[in-house]
């Protein structure tokens, strides 16, 4: 989009602040992996792997740095992520042998909006060492992943809840929706 998108404002707040607000009630600590944007109160950590190895490497860094057994992973450009959804996914993570709880909407999983057990760290490291870069690919080969779909509607319009701002068109839509 031509500049650091996490600092772009939607509804009067930078994108990253929307995500921070959604996480702040359910998460003991906010970790910001990579990126050049600053977020007051967050602990900033770098990817542990050289080069740009994608979101799975960011998840690895976050899991490694986390001080608690359950971690919520969220992309920094989700202006409509809700506190209720974050809390719900983390709560579902505590059920039995579940190691990750991921939204699935319209046939597509959203692994950059999910709850992960810190115990997944060895599996993530191994997958990265073996050349896996895609989070979805990693999750497909992992036992104990739970996908949630219809229940997303309890927290709002799933299309908005899971929206990322990846283009000028997405930004225009987000600003329009935020103004409603």
Where are the regions a protein language model picked out?
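Nucleotide and nucleotide-moiety/phosphate-recognizing core
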Residues: 1-160, 172-179
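Long hydrophobic alpha-helical segments typical of transmembrane helices together
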Residues: 167, 179-180
């Amino acid at each position: 989009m031509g500049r650091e998108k996490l600092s772009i404002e939607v509804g009067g707040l930078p994108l990253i602040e929307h995500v921070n607000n959604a996480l702040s009630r359910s998460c003991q600590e906010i970790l910001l992996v990579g990126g050049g944007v600053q977020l007051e109160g967050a602990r900033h950590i770098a990817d542990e792997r050289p080069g740009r190895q994608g979101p799975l490497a960011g998840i690895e860094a976050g899991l490694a740095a986390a001080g608690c057994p359950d971690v919520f992973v969220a992309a920094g450009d989700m202006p409509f992520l809700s506190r209720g959804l974050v809390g719900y996914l983390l709560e579902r993570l505590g059920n039995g042998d579940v190691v990750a709880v991921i939204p699935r909407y319209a046939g597509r999983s959203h692994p950059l909006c999910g709850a992960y057990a810190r115990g997944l760290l060895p599996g993530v490291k191994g997958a990265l060492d073996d050349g896996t870069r895609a989070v979805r690919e990693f999750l497909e080969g992992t036992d104990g992943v739970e996908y949630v779909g219809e229940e997303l509607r309890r927290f709002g319009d799933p299309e908005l809840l899971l929206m990322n701002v990846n283009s000028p068109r997405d930004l225009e839509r987000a600003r329009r929706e935020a103004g409603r």
